[in-house]
Amino acid sequence: MQMKNGWTRGQFRIFRVTFGIYLLYHFLSLLPWGPELFSSQGVLSQGTMSPLFHLFPNLFLLWDSPLFVQACLLAAAIFSLLLTFGKFDRVMAVMVWYVWASLYGRNPLIGNPSLPFIGWILLAYALIPSLSARDELSSTSEDTGFWRMPADIFAAAWILMALTYSYSGYCKLISPSWMDGTALHHVLSNPLARDTVVRTSLLALPAWSLKAATWSALFLELAFAPLALIRRLRPLLWVAMVGLHLGLLVLVNFSDLTIGMLILHFFTFDPAWIPSPEPVGQSIFYDGHCGLCHGLVRFILNEDHSAHPFSFAPLQGEEVKRSIAESVRAELPDSVVVVDENKNVLTRSAAVIYVLKRLGGLWFLGATLLSLVPRTLRDLAYDGVASVRKRIFGRTEEVCPLVPRQLRARFLH
């Protein structure tokens, strides 16, 4: 089974950074408790007390002193940081997985439902094509440089998630509190529940409403796997479960579980669920002697896989004279200018927002958030970057970036 998806190189980098920060926080938060949880002087003084200890060559088989445990946690934090910045990221994913699995094998009492998912994602990450292998589009490459999330890995993640949710719901059928609808009330009354206005307000609701919420959550879990077979229902199921986990994050002080599950949902998110409009005839004019502008062009080439992609031309070329009236050109900035499908000329932050919305997926969400910022502030930030771009990113002699032969038709002359 394969599932096509809309992940692109740039969007998956956002996942990588988010994932890496989560792992870094996880290991750093464990540092003060490491000796108590995993060492020979902790709650399980002997590793053999764990039924999982000998399932594979555990890191702590030969040595589990408090100092060694903390050194391993610190090393895992460093590996996570390197993964965050994309340095040997696939190797770092395997290294983090090994520490992750060893810690769980040494003390399974730390377990929560998200830990196996995170371990699986680490291994899956190691099998995903490198995000940097063709990061710079080469003029001699026959490949367009387009990166894609492998469809079989994406499908495997969805199958694993769907079956686990439905199995979790099935197991809840033998729980009296889930069957009589009082499970949510018990969660809100639990010592781990956050003492907030939201919790107090929910406890004040009629008993039937909490029961309805409990049974709705149970039905969602039970039906997740069969309903996920229907492609059009997957976004709705995904959003419903994310909403459920966000609710738990607000209500219950067990963030390590909830954030881990949200990481799984981020991995199974399909950017194609947020399609971009595909107008015809939009062009981007850029400063041909600006290193940052060349980088922007390469970024858009990597991210724009639409049927009617952007065309490009340098501001120093002849195409800009044919496309934009002289009276308008006199007022244009010398960085990036967009001419949309209606021949409107967009500059500064308006041009950035248009391009991001046009790329769809996570970029569309980012553009939507950016559009909430007053334009005066957006343009001020844009002008600040534009004023120092050549000092920081350098100048280029060639007005067109180096790109594969197949992409050269995207450049207007």
Language model region names:
Residues 1-286, 291-303, 310-318:
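Alpha-helical membrane-anchoring segments
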Residues 302-306, 411-413:
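Short cysteine/histidine-rich zinc-coordinating motifs and their immediately flanking basic loops
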Residues 317-413:
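Thiol/selenol-based redox catalytic cores and closely related redox-interacting motifs
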